[in-house]
């Protein structure tokens, strides 16, 4: 071993001790999770929920766009129809063990029924418990868009009421009045 190799080795040791000394008194990045809350960015994508419109009905019209947009195929649903012609999902199932929380299902949904919330505490001991049914996904409120009602915007009539007479429904727009 030459003197040059000895000095290089000593220099690397001094540099390592110096770096450790600098980082020893720096603020720690590790958070003690259950005791300290975790900072979540404003657009954090967590648990998927199904929302309701302002009238209290479920927003999902079972158009199947969310299942088609899902890159891993973790969403499955079956369409059914009420007496007044509205579509709804007979069953709606999401397998969270396969979901990558990409948000493509939320973007594809025309009724804003499917939304990603900042909830991330979904740990289970069995994989079968990560398959959520419609009853597990439905929340009581409208979610991020409290005033949006798909059927009011679409103009579909409700059985027994004329267009524009339903609760939270706007009067129909006369398209001829919009012409220049």
Swiss-Prot record:
The keyword Metal-binding applies. GO terms for molecular function: 4 iron, 4 sulfur cluster binding; iron ion binding; NADH:ubiquinone reductase (non-electrogenic) activity; quinone binding. NCBIfam families: NuoI, PRK05888.1-1. The gene is nuoI. One of its GO terms (cellular component) is NADH dehydrogenase complex. Its EC number is 7.1.1.-. InterPro entries: 4Fe4S_Fe-S-bd (IPR017896), 4Fe4S_Fe_S_CS (IPR017900), NADH_quinone_OxRdtase_chainI (IPR010226). Its main location: membrane. The lineage of its organism: Bacteria, Pseudomonadati, Pseudomonadota, Gammaproteobacteria, Enterobacterales. Its cofactor is [4Fe-4S] cluster. [4Fe-4S] cluster 1 binds at residues 60, 63, 66, 109. Binds 2 [4Fe-4S] clusters per subunit. NDH-1 shuttles electrons from NADH, via FMN and iron-sulfur (Fe-S) centers, to quinones in the respiratory chain. The immediate electron acceptor for the enzyme in this species is believed to be ubiquinone. Couples the redox reaction to proton translocation (for every two electrons transferred, four hydrogen ions are translocated across the cytoplasmic membrane), and thus conserves the redox energy in a proton gradient. Keywords: 4Fe-4S, Cell inner membrane, Cell membrane, Iron, Iron-sulfur, Membrane, Metal-binding, NAD, Quinone, Repeat, Translocase, Ubiquinone. Gene3D superfamilies: 3.30.70.3270. Belongs to the complex I 23 kDa subunit family. It catalyses: a quinone + NADH + 5 H(+)(in) = a quinol + NAD(+) + 4 H(+)(out). This is NADH-quinone oxidoreductase subunit I. [4Fe-4S] cluster 2 binds at residues 70, 99, 102, 105. Residues 50-80, 90-119 form the 4Fe-4S ferredoxin-type domain. The keyword Repeat applies. It is a peripheral membrane protein. PANTHER family: NADH DEHYDROGENASE [UBIQUINONE] IRON-SULFUR PROTEIN 8, MITOCHONDRIAL, NADH DEHYDROGENASE UBIQUINONE IRON-SULFUR PROTEIN 8, MITOCHONDRIAL. It is found in: Cell inner membrane. NDH-1 is composed of 13 different subunits. Subunits NuoA, H, J, K, L, M, N constitute the membrane sector of the complex. One of its GO terms (biological process) is aerobic respiration.
């Amino acid at each position: 071993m030459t003197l040059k190799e000895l000095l290089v080795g000593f220099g690397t040791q001094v540099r390592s001790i110096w770096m450790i000394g600098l980082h020893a008194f720096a603020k720690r990045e590790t958070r003690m999770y259950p005791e300290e809350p975790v900072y979540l960015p404003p657009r954090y994508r967590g648990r998927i929920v199904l929302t309701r419109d302002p009238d209290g009905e479920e927003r999902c019209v079972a158009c199947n766009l969310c299942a088609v947009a899902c890159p891993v195929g973790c969403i499955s649903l079956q369409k059914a129809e009420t007496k007044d012609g509205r579509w709804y999902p007979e069953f709606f199932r999401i397998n969270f063990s396969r979901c990558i929380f990409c948000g493509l299902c939320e973007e594809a949904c025309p009724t804003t029924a499917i939304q990603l919330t900042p909830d991330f505490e979904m740990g289970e001991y069995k994989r079968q418990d990560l398959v959520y049914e419609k009853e597990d996904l439905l929340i009581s409120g409208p979610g991020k868009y409290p005033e949006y009602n798909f059927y009011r915007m679409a103009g579909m009539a409700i059985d027994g009421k004329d267009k524009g007479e339903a609760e939270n429904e706007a009067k129909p727009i006369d398209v001829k009045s919009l012409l220049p």
